[in-house]
Amino acid sequence: MSEVKQYEGREYDVIVVGAGHAGSEAALAAARMGNKTLLMTINLDMVAFMPCNPSIGGPAKGIVVREIDALGGEMGRNIDKTYVQMRMLNTGKGPAVRALRAQADKHAYHAEMKKTIEAEPNLTLRQGIVDDLIVEDGVCKGVITNTGARYQAKSVVLTLGTAARGKIIIGELQYSSGPNNSQAALELTKNLTEKYHFDLERFKTGTPPRVDGGTINYDETEEQPGDEVPNHFSFQTPDSKYIELKNQLSCWLTYTNEKTHEIIRENLDRAPMFSGMIEGVGPRYCPSIEDKIVRFADKSRHQLFLEPEGRKTDEWYVQGLSTSMPEEVQQQILHSIKGLEEAEMMRPGYAIEYDVVAPYQLKNTLETKLVKNLYTAGQTNGTSGYEEAAGQGLIAGINAGRRALGKEPLTLKRSDAYIGVMIDDLVTKGTKEPYRLLTSRAEYRLILRHDNADLRLTEVGHNLGLVSDEEYNAFLEKKQDIKDELQRLSEIRIKPSQVQKFLESKGSNGLKDGVLASEFLRRPEVNYSDLLKFIDAPEKDLDRRVIEQVEIETKYAGYIKKAQDRVDRLKRMEEKAIPDRIDYEAINGLATEGRQKLEKIRPTTIAQASRISGVTPADIAILSVYIQQGKIAKIAE
């Protein structure tokens, strides 16, 4: 085969490779900051496509979407335009774990995001496959496509997803493919490891079969409707845009059973996961149905949610039934389940293996340590999930854009955002399996709530140029309204006689002395609307999201203060920087494992070093003293 002749294409400030959820955010962020940006994708019909679950949000993930929105990203706005159902999860629990989840019209989501990208003045969308990078003296200067085009740029972002040497597996069948039977990118990650010496890993994920909604017996399943109370992901979407419950699409709940499990057990010898065909490591928190049956053999049933894929399709997603079993076995499994006895399978489930850049090779900015001006994001970094990908894509795009503009990078700390938690986990601890964000990963989750993402991050987004002045002024007004109402409640006193009957009706003890309105609101049986029965309403008609903040900040004030004190202590450690070129071999007293881990990950602060597995408190003490005593003469020249 003759070699493709190369030619010089246009020059850009930023090039983003891959237009999934990470790439879309990265390209929009870079372009909106004033950079001439090129977004390359294998297939223009796959921009921001949802090859797996047709949903956005959920525990921890929904908070990330709010954070993306507060920073000026697009995912929240896009799902607000294209959802078919909206639900707030964990409403019976505390505010730290509440999260919004939307059922998406996956085709509308893709089309709307593509339209947004095409309308962005500084952004060029182009179909093509990137095979290699242009690297000179360790600096990335652009990309080379399989058609021979050489595009020069000041910085490059790779968001390759599962297309990176992707391989689909269904039973005994396996073939090279990206997600949803799209084309795989075969050369780029091969060059990353062979030419640029990146350490790659092989991960696996999977997807369930899709069934024809017209063949589901819904009478045998349990309806899961959306919420009546308005909620959106974007802080800019008004309640008036909320879809009435009667116009939302329901999901439906069913279960596997002993017959299902028997079919799976009888065919385990044909399951690629157990036959040795699958080499990649799969996600712990989203196992295949065959893996569940083996790992949780004592369970008599597993939940399955039947989810619509959109308003203009009859395809339904069977959440919880991810599998790579042979096609005919998948049909048997489906027909053993209540409500799916006559279901027609429209697409079989499959497993897909793909390449991952081991994330210890990244900085907190998502720039690679091996090649300057090269950034990576999304599943390329070992994460799973659209939301995790979009969060990383936004940060990578911001930092690639700021590098092109000659500005300092943005880094989010663990105490700033779930996005900061995720990136710190990846670059500090690495991951040996597809990484999923969980509320339990965030030690400051009471501060990192879905309801206060704008209060945490809008200022940052505005400073970056991603949040408009109009949006910022609306945010400042909301912030002032919260402050004013909290102050007002701290100045109003309530007499015991005013609330005696109310407290008796709640089965609560009465007051002996008068209390401030803020103290009365702190009681668990009292909400803001109850409080207004005993005091004057504020002069201004407050938005419900202002009232929500007033309630949360009042009721959880003590816990929030304790969490903030811990954050302040962490910040002092974060301020203790570790010199870039420190020579860990020159530091006497470090344990062998600690020395090896510090050398491999090369943390930038004492706080980050303390979070590395295998680095002991004694190692941290020695390292701190070494830096404090100014023994930097031993830093490698």
Curated annotation (Swiss-Prot):
Record flagged with keyword Transcription regulation: no
Subcellular location as annotated: Cytoplasm
UniProt keyword list: Cytoplasm, FAD, Flavoprotein, NAD, tRNA processing
GO CC annotation terms, alphabetical: cytosol
Chain positions recorded as FAD binding sites: G18, A19, G20, H21, A22, G23
One record GO biological process: tRNA methylation
Positions of NAD(+) binding: 282-296
PROSITE patterns noted in UniProt: GIDA_1 (PS01280), GIDA_2 (PS01281)
Cofactor list: FAD
Main location class: cytoplasm
PANTHER family assigned: GLUCOSE INHIBITED DIVISION PROTEIN A (PTHR11806), PROTEIN MTO1 HOMOLOG, MITOCHONDRIAL (PTHR11806:SF0)
Oligomeric form and interacting partners: Homodimer. Heterotetramer of two MnmE and two MnmG subunits.
UniProt name for this protein: tRNA uridine 5-carboxymethylaminomethyl modification enzyme MnmG
Organism from which the protein derives: Pediococcus pentosaceus (strain ATCC 25745 / CCUG 21536 / LMG 10740 / 183-1w)
Lineage summary: Bacteria, Bacillati, Bacillota, Bacilli, Lactobacillales
Name of the gene encoding the protein in the UniProt record: mnmG
